[in-house]
Structure formats: structure tokens, C-alpha cells
A protein has these predicted regions:
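Short Gly/Thr/Asp-enriched flexible loops that form oxyanion-binding sites at enzyme active sites
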Residues: 130-143
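Glycine-rich phosphate-binding loop signature in dinucleotide/nucleotide-binding domains
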Residues: 112-119
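Electrostatically charged, flexible surface regions
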Residues: 151-262
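Conserved acidic residues
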Residues: 86, 119, 179
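N-terminal beta-strand-loop-alpha-helix module at the start
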Residues: 1-60
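Short beta-strand segments
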Residues: 4-8, 59, 91, 123-125, ...
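A glycine-rich helix N-cap at a beta->alpha junction
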Residues: 71-100, 183
Length: 262
């Protein structure tokens, strides 16, 4: 059983650094494995322990600068190997720092296709810092593998897999075949902690590093441009001899501004 687990190095919400102006200092805030991704990793390891195979971790560093973050990031990746993953494939490139959800998803999709085919792809339902809940669905469209989200239980059978989806007021059971992408909730398991022996053994497990140029991405802008659009009041005062005249003028202004259509 070939198992791919996607890990995000999120901002450590317990160690947020705030500057004197009250703005979160992203560069000084430490990284940590996103909580739901710990559940994804645990589930991948449990599947490997039951059916055999290999767990491969995939990740991209999205907080920079890369030169400053790399040691902390690789510590996190090494932690996933200590917990039980067999190898890790990571993207280290300044072009992905601050990239959009689509750009990061595309980079990881190309990376996983470059490495090989997998029977099951597991990710957390959302990251603990941005919580966009998008990755599983985006990955599905990019590698053409069906995705089932918000899964709280996985039962792999001889030819099929039963997935228990956690909806608001019910549990939905879906029967499907492999390969499949699964995003898991926090209720699916209790993540384990690595032993000292596992931590030492993790140093011998491989971490494969890639840049954006290694992934044959299409030409698109991986940079983020932030512009603050000027906002100013027009200070239009509506005056008239009576309410009827004022109402007519107000309606005309609203129509001219495109706010009102009659």
C-alpha cells in the first residue's frame, strides 16, 4: 500500500510573535505541524501497519524567507519521519513563500505526480493557521483522483474502502475504490508521539528536496502583489425644498453611481 500524506508547516499559534504596532510578525513566529495533518499522518501510519507498504510525506514551505526558515522547517519534516513516515519530499523555493492556495496545490500536485502513483492520499481537513479547507478538492482536480472530505473513519476492505464522513447532523458512509484522496477530521484518531529510538532512527530516513523549476510548472506568476486601493468619500449632500424633491435627487444619484437600477 503506497500512502501519500500531505503536511503543512503552519504558524505555531501558541508562539505567535506580535510587534509593537500589534501586527503578527510572521518571520519571527515558529512553525509547527498543522494539527489535522498530525491526524492524517497517524492514519497513514496505521494503514501501513495493517496492510504494509510505505508512507511518503509531501510538503511545501510557504513561510519565508527560506534561508531563515529552512532549519525549523526541516526539523518539522524530520519529526514526521520520527513519528513513522518512511520518506519525505519537500519543496523549498522562495517563489512559494506567500503563494496562493492554487499555486501551492499545483506545485504539490506536480511533485506527487513526479514521485509516482499512490493508493491513498491523506491530508488534514484544514490547516490550523489559514483554515481554507481547499487543498483536498484542489488536489483532486489536479491529479484526477476523487476526493472525500471530512472523514472520521477509514475502513479499507479487499477491493474497496469505506469512508465515514462527518456531516453536521449525520454520518455519511461512502463506498469507493482506490486510489482516493481523503481529508480527515480530528476525531479520526489520537496522534502518537515518537520515542527516543524513533527520533534517532529518523536521521537516517531520506528527505528529498525540490525547487519550483524541478516540477515543470506552467508559466504563471508565483509572486503576490498587494495593493491598497484608495477609498474616499464623495461628500454628496442631497438638498431640496421638500422630501419628494430630495427623494428624487437621491434616487438619481444612486442610479448614476450604479448602486440602484430601475
Amino acid at each position: 500500500m503506497n500512502i501519500a500524506v500531505f503536511i503543512k508547516a503552519s504558524l505555531n499559534l501558541n508562539l505567535i510573535k506580535v510587534d509593537s504596532s500589534g501586527i503578527v510578525n510572521l518571520e519571527e513566529t515558529a512553525l509547527a505541524i498543522s494539527e489535522y495533518d498530525k491526524n492524517a499522518l497517524e492514519e497513514g501510519i496505521r494503514i501501513k501497519e495493517k496492510f504494509g507498504g510505505k508512507v511518503s510525506v509531501f510538503s511545501a514551505l510557504t513561510y519565508g524567507p527560506v534561508s531563515k526558515r529552512q532549519a525549523d522547517y526541516e526539523r518539522i519534516i524530520r519529526e514526521t519521519l520520527a513519528i513513522g513516515a518512511d520518506e519525505a519530499h519537500i519543496i523549498l523555493d522562495e517563489k512559494l513563500v506567500g503563494a496562493s492556495n492554487f499555486e501551492v496545490s499545483l506545485a504539490l500536485a506536480n511533485l506527487v505526480k513526479k514521485v509516482g502513483a499512490f493508493d491513498i492520499y491523506i491530508t488534514g481537513e484544514a490547516s490550523m493557521d489559514t483554515s481554507s479547507y481547499q487543498f483536498a478538492s484542489r488536489l483532486s482536480s489536479l491529479i484526477n483522483v476523487p476526493a472525500i472530505t471530512f472523514v472520521r473513519k477509514i475502513e479499507i476492505q479487499e477491493k474497496d474502502v469505506l469512508l465515514y464522513r462527518d456531516l453536521e447532523d449525520e454520518i455519511q458512509i461512502i463506498k469507493t475504490s482506490l486510489p482516493v484522496i481523503v481529508s480527515v477530521t480530528g476525531e479520526i484518531n489520537q496522534p502518537r508521539l515518537p520515542t527516543l529510538k524513533q527520533i534517532l532512527q529518523s536521521k537516517t530516513k531520506p528527505i528529498f528536496k525540490y525547487s519550483v523549476t524541478d516540477l515543470e510548472l506552467p508559466k504563471f506568476d508565483l509572486s503576490k502583489e498587494i495593493r491598497i486601493l484608495p477609498v474616499s468619500r464623495k461628500n454628496i449632500f442631497v438638498e431640496g425644498k421638500n422630501l419628494e424633491e430630495i427623494s428624487e435627487k437621491l434616487i438619481k444619484y444612486l442610479i448614476d453611481e450604479g448602486v440602484l437600477k430601475i
